[in-house]
Amino acid sequence: MITLPARPESLTFAPQQSALIVVDMQNAYASQGGYLDLAGFDVSATRPVIVNINTAVAAARAAGMLIIWFQNGWDDQYVEAGGPGSPNYHKSNALKTMRQRPELQGKLLAKGGWDYQLVDELTPQEGDIVLPKPRYSGFFNTPLDSILRSRGIRHLVFTGIATNVCVESTLRDGFFLEYFGIVLEDATHQAGPAFAQQAALFNIETFFGWVSDVESFCHALSPATPLSLAKEKRYA
């Protein structure tokens, strides 16, 4: 068992009965020229997040935690995205950007394309699980719940992009399904202004889960392990 310092209080759990979830660390969300960048969102601060996720993944893997990687997107014909009868058709900024810029049609969040791929610095390894998801929440239309329940996993540690969209959506759905959700704040990044990150973390800490950081997570798993973290204070 480990005890992880977190807000509003510490949590105690077994690493082998928990999972580290890496949400949507794709070129779409973390790279210049990806969907978020093309849609007008600032992705300039994602490099430290990638470094910190790598650190968290290495610590989790060494401790025997299951690592689950999500990739958000759809088939190259966008059937999975939903047509005009779907709210996703109207609210997805990727779909809206492609309608506004026809030259991008088929390039954003399409399975098999560069935008859909995980960033080069983050590579799943044997024993990890990689799951596609068609909507913001990793629980919707995916086998995530059955994967976790069949392994007796109740504690989920979240990293990835975007904190205020897919990370928070997945953590919230997990809360409703009786999972304990913890987000590592310095291994996440928001889509939008800094207050979106602050608001998401407030919601999680106050209503739906717990907030910790990569250093605390790694020290809890292996107190003697030296860390290599990206130190960048981005939020007041």
UniProtKB/Swiss-Prot annotation:
GO molecular function, one term: hydrolase activity, acting on carbon-nitrogen (but not peptide) bonds, in linear amides
CDD domains, sorted: cysteine_hydrolases (cd00431)
InterPro entries assigned to the protein according to its UniProt record, in alphabetical order: Isochorismatase-like_dom, Isochorismatase-like_hydrls, Isochorismatase-like_sf, RutB
BP term (GO), one: nitrogen utilization
Domain of life: Bacteria
KW Signal (keyword) present: no
A Pfam family recorded for this sequence: Isochorismatase
Class of enzymatic activity (EC top level): hydrolase
EC number: 3.5.1.110
Alphabetized UniProt keyword annotations: Hydrolase
Catalyzed reactions: (Z)-3-ureidoacrylate + H2O + H(+) = (Z)-3-aminoacrylate + NH4(+) + CO2; (Z)-3-ureidoacrylate + H2O = (Z)-3-aminoacrylate + carbamate + H(+); (Z)-2-methylureidoacrylate + H2O + H(+) = (Z)-2-methylaminoacrylate + NH4(+) + CO2
Active site residues according to the UniProt entry: 24 (proton acceptor), 133, 166 (nucleophile)
PANTHER family xref list: ISOCHORISMATASE-LIKE DOMAIN-CONTAINING PROTEIN, PEROXYUREIDOACRYLATE/UREIDOACRYLATE AMIDOHYDROLASE-RELATED
Function: Hydrolyzes ureidoacrylate to form aminoacrylate and carbamate. The carbamate hydrolyzes spontaneously, thereby releasing one of the nitrogen atoms of the pyrimidine ring as ammonia and one of its carbon atoms as CO2.
HAMAP family, per database record: RutB (MF_00830)
Assigned protein family: Belongs to the isochorismatase family. RutB subfamily.
Name of the protein: Ureidoacrylate amidohydrolase RutB
Natural source organism: Klebsiella pneumoniae (strain 342)
